């Protein structure tokens, strides 16, 4: 790390760990998810897609596995992005593609689970109708519709993701409108300045550290911070000659979005319009001294003194809002990708349980029901933190202690959501029959047991029992 002239600042920076505990946990989760998910989902795709007979159940779970497999393919990029602390070295296309794949997985998975829940409910309540209308062709058609809708839902991610260059570091983040005033939410970090008592007549170089306020970046598909809520280490920033000034030690915490400039005007966030910056002379004689009281912040303060409020605070307050597209994306994901499917699934499985208590069902039907319930439960456990953090980031002030805490756990919530991609193959193997019996089965036998068609199985069982009775009768005679 680059040391500063101020001993206290240097000590703080050296004592700060490179990664917070939640960052390390996120890396571990992403690494294990990628390894286990690629192996498990790849095996299920091969066996269920090639070795097994195609049934309605195998169609459902095959497409669900495909969505998980695609998500696992994107995880190495997300893991590297987290390790590199927000730097995105893969270019613009992958900046758009990788977050889109994660959101595609979320919507495809939740829509497929909703379809599976409705299918389970129809089998229990309308078995005769299912025997006549439930077929593989219909299942493939529904899965096709699911993929189309999921693709449409992830289009905003692909459209709004953009690549920004800041001091030779590439940042992958949302760009909702680069032509308007920059948004308060886009970039939030603190720049520590060295002590200096001289004014450079040409260019003042301000070297410092980005404050690790939310720890190294989110990985992700998160709406705001696949960005520089990251610890960008030892980044030099330049001020223009006409705006150079002298100061002792100050903490600057600008908020800027759009395309980050390579030259920052001293004491004025680059997000403010150019005409406002030009209309104010910014130098030490005008308003700033070594003992000027600064705006209070979550850490040590803003570079804006109180007598500067009249010029910029009104506009700063105006820009302190969440972009409308970001609000729409987050709310749509919450409602369409979480709440509505959740209520549909709760209703479906409640009806199934109510009916199963009144009627005797085959073990095969109970087994497939358990698999479906387990998959749905794990999905909502994994994705609930993601949506919760997304909503909290919309409504909390990033300068508050709650806002900082939420941002610090953002990447963890996305790692947990991604972890859902590796669980399903193990659920298929562990549920349905006794585990000791499964351990002696082939992979094909395990999946056939998990995805067995209960209607067909029940019919076959009935036919087997009938033939057995006929054989017994002929033997007795």
Curated annotation (Swiss-Prot):
It is a multi-pass membrane protein. The modification Phosphothreonine is found at residue 456. Glycans are attached at residues 9, 168, 197, 201. The keyword Protease does not apply. The modification Phosphoserine is found at residue 452. Residues 1-23, 81-96, 161-333, 394-410 are extracellular. Signal peptide: none annotated. Disulfide bonds join 95-172. The modification Sulfotyrosine is found at residues 174, 184, 312. Keywords: Cell membrane, Chemotaxis, Disulfide bond, G-protein coupled receptor, Glycoprotein, Membrane, Phosphoprotein, Receptor, Sulfation, Transducer, Transmembrane, Transmembrane helix. Its main location: membrane. Residues 47-57, 119-139, 354-370, 432-477 are cytoplasmic. GO terms for cellular component: plasma membrane. Detected in varying levels in all tissues examined except the spleen. Especially abundant in heart and lung. The keyword Cell membrane applies. Receptor for the chemotactic and inflammatory peptide anaphylatoxin C3a. This receptor stimulates chemotaxis, granule enzyme release and superoxide anion production. PANTHER family: C3A ANAPHYLATOXIN CHEMOTACTIC RECEPTOR, CHEMOTACTIC RECEPTOR. This is C3a anaphylatoxin chemotactic receptor. It comes from Mus musculus. The lineage of its organism: Eukaryota, Metazoa, Chordata, Craniata, Vertebrata. The gene is C3ar1.
């Amino acid at each position: 790390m680059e040391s500063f002239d101020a001993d206290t600042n240097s000590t703080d920076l050296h004592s700060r760990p490179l990664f917070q505990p939640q960052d390390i946990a996120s890396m571990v989760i992403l690494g294990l998810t990628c390894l286990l998910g690629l192996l498990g989902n790849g095996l299920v795709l091969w066996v269920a897609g090639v070795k097994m007979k195609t049934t309605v159940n195998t169609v459902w779970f095959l497409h669900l596995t495909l969505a998980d497999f695609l998500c696992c393919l994107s995880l190495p990029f997300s893991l590297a992005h987290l390790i590199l602390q927000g730097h995105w070295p893969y270019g613009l296309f992958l900046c758009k593609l990788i977050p889109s794949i994660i959101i595609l997985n979320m919507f495809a998975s939740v829509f497929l689970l909703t379809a599976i829940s409705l299918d389970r409910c129809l089998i229990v309540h309308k078995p005769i109708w299912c025997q006549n209308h439930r077929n593989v062709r219909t299942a493939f058609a529904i899965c096709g519709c699911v993929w189309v809708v999921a693709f449409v839902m992830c289009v905003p991610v692909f459209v709004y993701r953009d690549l920004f260059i800041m001091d030779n570091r590439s940042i992958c983040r949302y760009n909702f409108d680069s032509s308007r005033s920059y948004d308060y939410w886009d970039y939030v970090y603190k720049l520590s300045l060295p002590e200096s008592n001289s004014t450079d007549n040409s260019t003042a170089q301000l070297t410092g550290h980005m404050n690790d306020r939310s720890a190294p970046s989110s990985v992700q598909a998160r709406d705001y911070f696949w960005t520089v809520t990251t610890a960008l280490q030892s980044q030099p920033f330049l001020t223009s000659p006409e705006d150079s000034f002298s100061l002792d030690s100050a903490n600057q915490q600008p908020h800027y979005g759009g395309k980050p400039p390579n030259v920052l005007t001293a004491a004025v966030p680059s997000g403010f319009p150019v005409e406002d910056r030009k209309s104010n002379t910014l130098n030490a004689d005008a308003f700033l001294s070594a003992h000027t009281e600064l705006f209070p912040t979550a850490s040590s303060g803003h570079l804006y003194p109180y007598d500067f409020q009249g010029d910029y605070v009104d506009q700063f307050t105006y820009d302190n809002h969440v972009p409308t597209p970001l609000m729409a994306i987050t709310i749509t994901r919450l409602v369409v990708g979480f709440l509505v499917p959740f209520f549909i699934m709760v209703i479906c499985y409640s009806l199934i349980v109510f009916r199963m208590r009144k009627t005797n069902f085959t073990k095969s039907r109970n087994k497939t029901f358990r698999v479906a319930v387990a998959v749905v439960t794990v999905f909502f456990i994994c994705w609930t933190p993601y949506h919760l953090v997304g909503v909290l980031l919309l409504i909390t002030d990033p300068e508050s202690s709650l806002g900082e805490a939420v941002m610090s756990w953002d990447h963890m919530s996305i790692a947990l959501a991604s972890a859902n991609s590796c669980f399903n193959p193990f659920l298929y193997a562990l549920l349905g029959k006794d585990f000791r019996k499964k351990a002696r089965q082939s992979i094909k036998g395990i999946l056939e047991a998990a995805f067995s068609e209960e209607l067909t199985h029940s019919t076959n069982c009935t036919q087997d029992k009938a033939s057995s009775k006929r054989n017994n009768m002929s033997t007795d005679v």
